[in-house]
Amino acid sequence: MAITLTWIGHATWLVDTGHGVLLVDPFFEESPTACMKGADVACDAILVTHGHADHVGDLVPIARRTGAPVY
């Protein structure tokens, strides 16, 4: 089974295990390097490495929209 890592920008990554997608440090809308919008993200879980704004900027709207648990 292959795991696909996709760098979105800044510290934001999508990790696709083939069984689900993990979003790491959701920071899209204020990120000058983000290659997509937070509204376009589909994920099964969200991992936040720490509480700085540039790692949690879009956490709440994405978690609410997707229902993904936050770790």
Question: In which residue ranges do the predicted regions lie?
Answer:
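Short internal beta-strands
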Residues: 44, 68-71
